């Protein structure tokens, strides 16, 4: 019996990216293979290579898509923060969004800034990654008195906490207390709020 395709003619490229992101969500970035994506999409193993010359090219497309999705969710979170005018609350809302995103999609900055993509030479990927930081950085700068180094350090700590929460949830480490995505998102937001308040106090003390 011939294999039935899961895509409509003309949108194979988008289908492959969506399918690849599903694989990443289930198994992680390292598990992604072109062959598995083709199998799930219901096409021949050669079909993806009409759009992506290699696994790396497919991964780049996934990273760009993930960055755009995350940027959109972060923008929405900023607008819906408890106090949109307070950069501390903006950062807390962003941490919650990032945690949900990483928990539900199986990746976050580890895909967008994957080591194997650092020398990819994709301007579109660089722009997509900058787009995420462009959403996060203004609030961090406001908290740290426009000190770029301190702002980046603050974001690094907040993202590390958020990503760590998501990873612990996905690994079932938190299963014994029946933690949910919302539980870890709230935890990440609390840490982000604490770190931002500490940074604000340090800036005001100078």
Residue ranges and their predicted role:
Residues 15, 19, 23-57:
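Helix-turn-helix
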Residues 12-21, 37, 62-66, 70, ...:
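Generic hydrophobic, amphipathic alpha-helix propensity
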Residues 64-91, 123, 127, 131, ...:
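Amphipathic alpha-helical linker/stalk segments
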Residues 159-177, 193-203:
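Amphipathic C-terminal alpha-helical segment
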């Amino acid at each position: 019996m011939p294999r039935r395709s899961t895509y409509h003619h003309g949108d194979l490229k988008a289908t492959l990216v969506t399918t690849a992101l599903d694989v990443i969500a289930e198994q992680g970035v390292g598990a992604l293979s072109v062959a598995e994506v083709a199998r799930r999409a219901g096409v021949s193993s050669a079909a993806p290579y009409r759009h992506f010359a290699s696994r790396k090219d497919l991964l780049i497309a996934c990273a760009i898509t993930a960055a755009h999705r995350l940027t959109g969710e972060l923008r929405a979170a900023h607008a819906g923060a408890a106090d949109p005018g307070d950069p501390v609350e903006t950062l807390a809302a962003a941490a919650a969004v990032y945690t949900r995103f990483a928990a539900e999609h199986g990746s976050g900055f580890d895909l967008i800034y994957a080591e194997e993509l650092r020398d990819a030479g994709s301007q579109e990927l660089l722009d997509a990654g900058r787009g995420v930081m462009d959403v996060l950085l203004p609030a961090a700068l406001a908290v740290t008195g426009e000190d770029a180094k301190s702002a980046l350090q603050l974001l690094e700590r907040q993202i590390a906490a958020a990503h760590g929460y998501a990873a612990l949830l996905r690994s079932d480490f938190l299963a014994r207390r029946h933690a949910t995505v919302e539980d870890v998102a709230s935890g990440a937001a609390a840490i982000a709020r604490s770190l931002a308040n500490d940074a604000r106090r340090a800036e005001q003390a100078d």
